[in-house]
């Protein structure tokens, strides 16, 4: 082998070694860069998860956020849902009840589908998506709670006081009419009783609503419980029992709201709806009234100085010094109900308490009722509905009778 050949082989070997070193260096550099990117990504994720909160940002910007809660029974069937608005700046929460047979839109071009059917086919994600499409609002927090979790949470706050409007005697549940104290298992049995008795979906939702409202009243009236709400143990105990996308900083702010709540913290309303030709409970005016209801409640929750414009088709009702409705002392705020029941069917509008309530009657049937309870201590009540709903209707305010003209 001559010297030239040996030199070429040596150069080839050197080139190969240099190429291997270069490739190794590239891999090392790529590994370092990937490690840095992964490290930065982990830091950003940890910061976002443990320190960043949309509620904190909304508080700084004086904005309101939207959330949704889905309640599910032991048979994995929804009781119903609530669309909610929260202001972390003003410590106020507004919720609108959605019964399980309310029709929601998956697509505005298609027909609406009942909430319980959406849950049956696509689970809670399908329900939350339909609520977003129906309302046109981005839901920041999505929460699901089942019967066991309802029971555990009620036990954690020491129980809830309820007003029973009719005598109950079934299985392990036996109560006379009047105020009763429920532990978690009794509360769940009470909700089961409503299903067994065949209550309408909207009425079952009202009773669930009563549990929520009375739990809030219990917190308001118990300073010790309010302070307990700030403890890490109670936060972890309650939040571990719900399925949600709430993160630690969100939970901290939410429990601060509960720890500083008062009788004006929670505002509860019900969606206005009517049965369509398919037998589905459908938001009135193809959902536009629901969106307006949300916008008005958002302004109220955010304590904005300007109210939404009242158009010609809107009608307003102001009741001064309205307190104390017999049998409804567990209500914390005014409610605007769609019921469609005949007068006296549930006994909420008997002659004894008619003088303390405002009702709208159409064609001899009670269409809506405006009521507050003794606990709320509200001097001024403001309610609004759409004038187009009031064809052929009259308003009875106390013992006074008003015709509603177009």
Where are these regions (language model features)?
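Extracytoplasmic
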Residues: 62-64, 77-81, 90-95, 110, ...
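Amphipathic, coiled-coil-like alpha-helical scaffolding segments used for oligomerization/assembly
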Residues: 121-178, 243-260, 265-268
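BRCT (BRCA1 C-terminal) domain core and associated BRCT-interaction motifs
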Residues: 342-404
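Extracytoplasmic/secreted envelope proteins and their assembly/folding machinery
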Residues: 80, 124-132, 147-151, 155, ...
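Entry/capping segment at the start of metal-dependent catalytic domains
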Residues: 2, 8-100
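Flexible, polar/acidic helix-loop-strand segments at domain edges
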Residues: 155-242
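C-terminal solvent-exposed extensions
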Residues: 71, 100-102, 111, 239-313, ...
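Second-shell loop/turn segments in exported
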Residues: 113-121, 135-141, 195-203, 223-224, ...
């Amino acid at each position: 082998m001559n010297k030239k050949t040996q030199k070429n082989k040596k150069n080839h070997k050197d080139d190969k070694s240099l190429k291997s070193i270069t490739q190794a260096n590239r891999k090392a550099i790529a590994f370092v860069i990937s490690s840095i990117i992964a490290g930065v990504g982990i830091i950003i994720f940890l910061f976002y998860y443990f320190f960043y909160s949309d509620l904190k940002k909304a508080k700084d910007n004086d904005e309101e956020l939207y959330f949704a809660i889905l309640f599910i029974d032991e048979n994995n069937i929804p009781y119903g849902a609530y669309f909610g608005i929260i202001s972390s700046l003003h410590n106020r929460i507004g919720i609108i009840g959605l019964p399980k047979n309310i029709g929601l839109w998956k697509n505005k071009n298609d027909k609406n589908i009942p909430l319980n059917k959406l849950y049956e086919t696509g689970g809670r994600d399908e329900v939350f998506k339909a609520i977003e499409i129906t309302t046109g609002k981005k839901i920041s927090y999505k929460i699901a709670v089942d019967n066991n979790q309802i029971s555990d949470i009620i036990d954690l706050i020491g129980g809830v006081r309820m007003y029973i409007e009719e005598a109950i005697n079934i299985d392990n549940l036996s109560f006379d009419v009047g105020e009763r104290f429920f532990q978690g298992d009794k509360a769940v049995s009470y909700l089961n009783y409503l299903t067994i008795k065949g209550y309408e979906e909207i009425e079952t939702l009202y009773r669930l609503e009563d549990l929520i409202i009375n739990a809030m009243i219990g917190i308001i009236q118990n300073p010790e419980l309010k302070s307990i709400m700030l403890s890490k143990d109670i936060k972890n105990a309650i939040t571990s029992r719900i399925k949600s996308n709430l993160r630690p900083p969100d939970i901290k702010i939410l429990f601060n709201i509960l720890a500083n709540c008062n009788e004006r913290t929670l505002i509860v309303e019900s969606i206005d709806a009517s049965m369509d030709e398919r037998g589905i409970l459908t938001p009135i005016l193809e959902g536009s009234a629901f969106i307006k209801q949300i916008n008005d409640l958002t302004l109220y929750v955010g304590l904005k100085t300007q109210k939404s414009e009242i158009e010609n088709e809107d009608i307003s009702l102001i009741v001064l010094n309205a307190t104390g409705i017999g049998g409804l002392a567990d209500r914390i705020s005014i409610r605007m109900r769609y019921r469609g029941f005949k007068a006296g069917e549930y006994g909420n509008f008997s002659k004894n308490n008619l003088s303390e309530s405002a009702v709208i009657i159409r064609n001899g049937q009670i269409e809506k009722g405006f009521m507050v309870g003794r606990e709320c201590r509200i001097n001024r009540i403001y309610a609004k509905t759409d004038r187009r709903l009031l064809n052929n209707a009259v308003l009875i305010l106390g013992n006074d009778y008003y015709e509603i003209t177009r």
